[in-house]
Amino acid sequence: MEMEKRTPVLDGQGINTVLIRLAREIIQRHTNLEPLVIIGVHTRGVHLARRLADTIAEINGRAIPTGDIDITLYRDDWTKIGYSPVVQSTQIGFPIDDKTVILVDDVLFTGRTTRAALDALTDFGRPAKVELAVLVDREGMRELPIQADYVGMFVKTDKAEMVNVLLSETDGEDAVVVNTP
């Protein structure tokens, strides 16, 4: 039986460095942070969104409202992942109408998760603008015309490979690894 090959791409320090860079890019692009809110896509996008908001606050001194969104029932493949999908809660404790929403996810792959998140987001209001921030962009794998505004790093992979983001909040460690069958 063959073992999967696990190739480390980023460690915890690397993830922190990337989040600092992304926070600075957001601050530079948005001189007025007042209309800005950050919403993470369950599960790891939620933790990254909180970390990103905390990093912006550390750099700029301005707290950014954060929320999280569950896209399970908005996915176009949920029947393929099981007839009893596990639905998590959505917590958006502020209006998003006329706000600039930065949607945060761990990995941008086909674009389908982002599409589902955009669909879910419209149930909560009509933002002035939505921008996408991802820790990892698996470039060249898109099935939909979706592109991130803020990218931590680009990782070139084969379709059969898996990019896994591990975060201390859910996995006990911070790392990005590529698993090759």
Curated annotation (Swiss-Prot):
Recorded superkingdom: Bacteria
UniProt keywords, alphabetically: Glycosyltransferase, Transcription, Transcription regulation, Transferase
Motif position, PRPP-binding: 101-113
CDD domains, A to Z: PRTases_typeI
Gene Ontology terms describing biological process: regulation of DNA-templated transcription
Signal peptide feature range: none
InterPro entries: PRibTrfase_dom, PRTase-like, PyrR, PyrR_bifunctional
Reaction catalyzed: UMP + diphosphate = 5-phospho-alpha-D-ribose 1-diphosphate + uracil
Listed EC numbers: 2.4.2.9
MF (Gene Ontology): uracil phosphoribosyltransferase activity
Cited Pfam families: Pribosyltran
Family: Belongs to the purine/pyrimidine phosphoribosyltransferase family. PyrR subfamily.
Primary role: Regulates the transcription of the pyrimidine nucleotide (pyr) operon in response to exogenous pyrimidines.
Protein name: Bifunctional protein PyrR
Organism, as annotated: Desulfosudis oleivorans (strain DSM 6200 / JCM 39069 / Hxd3)
